[in-house]
């Protein structure tokens, strides 16, 4: 058997420490063809270019 990193007594420590956040109610995502259309619009129609004309998948900054 392989070596285990740390004792199994500490298993799940981080998960038990994180505060529980309730799921939020969101509008439903389109399915199938409509979802593909949404992706197309997001990627190619509302183009957000970076410096040098590059596109980024997650242009938050």
UniProtKB/Swiss-Prot annotation:
Cross-referenced Pfam families: Ribosomal_S30
Localization annotation: Cytoplasm; Nucleus
Principal cellular location given in the protein's record: cytoplasm
The keyword Nuclease belongs to this UniProt entry's keyword annotation: no
Molecular function GO terms recorded: structural constituent of ribosome
GO cellular component, one term: cytosolic small ribosomal subunit
Residue ranges of the region described as Disordered: 1-36
Keyword set includes Secreted: no
Keywords (A to Z) from UniProt: Cytoplasm, Nucleus, Ribonucleoprotein, Ribosomal protein
UniProt record, GO biological process: cytoplasmic translation
InterPro entries hit by this protein: Ribosomal_eS30 (IPR006846)
Described function: Component of the ribosome, a large ribonucleoprotein complex responsible for the synthesis of proteins in the cell. The small ribosomal subunit (SSU) binds messenger RNAs (mRNAs) and translates the encoded message by selecting cognate aminoacyl-transfer RNA (tRNA) molecules. The large subunit (LSU) contains the ribosomal catalytic site termed the peptidyl transferase center (PTC), which catalyzes the formation of peptide bonds, thereby polymerizing the amino acids delivered by tRNAs into a polypeptide chain.
Note: There are 2 genes for eS30 in S.pombe.
Family: Belongs to the eukaryotic ribosomal protein eS30 family.
Assembly and binders: Component of the small ribosomal subunit (SSU). Mature yeast ribosomes consist of a small (40S) and a large (60S) subunit. The 40S small subunit contains 1 molecule of ribosomal RNA (18S rRNA) and at least 33 different proteins. The large 60S subunit contains 3 rRNA molecules (25S, 5.8S and 5S rRNA) and at least 46 different proteins.
Stated name of the protein: Small ribosomal subunit protein eS30A
Taxonomic source organism: Schizosaccharomyces pombe (strain 972 / ATCC 24843) (Fission yeast)
């Amino acid at each position: 058997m392989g070596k285990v990193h740390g004792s199994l007594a500490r298993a799940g420590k981080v998960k038990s420490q994180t505060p529980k956040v309730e799921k939020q109610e969101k509008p439903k995502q389109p399915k199938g063809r409509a979802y593909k259309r949404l992706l197309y619009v997001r990627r190619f129609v509302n183009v957000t270019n970076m410096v040098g004309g590059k596109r980024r998948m997650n242009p938050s900054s």
